[in-house]
């Protein structure tokens, strides 16, 4: 099944973007080629842009604290797997402690590093990081891969508590949902929400159908419409019945 996720609010939208950026960063950092480490570095700059929001850290801390207070009363409950509960609570408490130790504006260390700031300003220009533009950066790219990797890992280090917090919040949100099998009649599906508030919708479709879900929602109803794309033609609505799995997640 192919998984599509749709955030219902700006906070979850930001967390999903950060998750995607951190995953891309980790992938390219693990590679060996200087061009792949260039992508890791520019992704680091993107992470800094998104995490630079003044309220992101406080929002994550409030959500983790809320989850901690929700889960803590289940300690000693015979109906709850205690080892799993303690693992989650320990992870939350450690991440809260790490977030509390973060000082100043997120990503400020990248701004204060004049060399990185010069690369960052050139990276937004198409082809702006050529060797004749940034010879010192080109020289750094000739260093051994492990040395470059250590440098980039050092630069991401102050942001890792945010990554851990994002991972926990999204995992708890996803685990809160229960998948149901539904059918989009003639490619269209709608469902009343009965006033319940959700943060995230997951749509899983069989890959062999080659359909693309488009979703929207308000506090009363959600809609899923399936489209198909042929070659370079823009997606068009399908008129066949589409079976899929729908999950609504609520922290």
Swiss-Prot record:
One example of a Gene Ontology biological process annotation: division septum assembly
InterPro entries with a match to the protein in the record: ZapD, ZapD_C, ZapD_sf
Keyword field contains Cell division: yes
Record's keyword terms, sorted: Cell cycle, Cell division, Cytoplasm, Septation
Superkingdom, natural source: Bacteria
Pfam families: ZapD
Keyword Lipid metabolism: no
GO cellular component, one term: cytoplasm
Subcellular location: Cytoplasm
HAMAP family reported for this sequence: ZapD
PANTHER family in the cross-refs: CELL DIVISION PROTEIN ZAPD
Family designation: Belongs to the ZapD family.
Subunit structure: Interacts with FtsZ.
Functional note: Cell division factor that enhances FtsZ-ring assembly. Directly interacts with FtsZ and promotes bundling of FtsZ protofilaments, with a reduction in FtsZ GTPase activity.
Protein name, as recorded: Cell division protein ZapD
Species annotation: Burkholderia lata (strain ATCC 17760 / DSM 23089 / LMG 22485 / NCIMB 9086 / R18194 / 383)
Lineage: Bacteria, Pseudomonadati, Pseudomonadota, Betaproteobacteria, Burkholderiales
Protein's gene: zapD
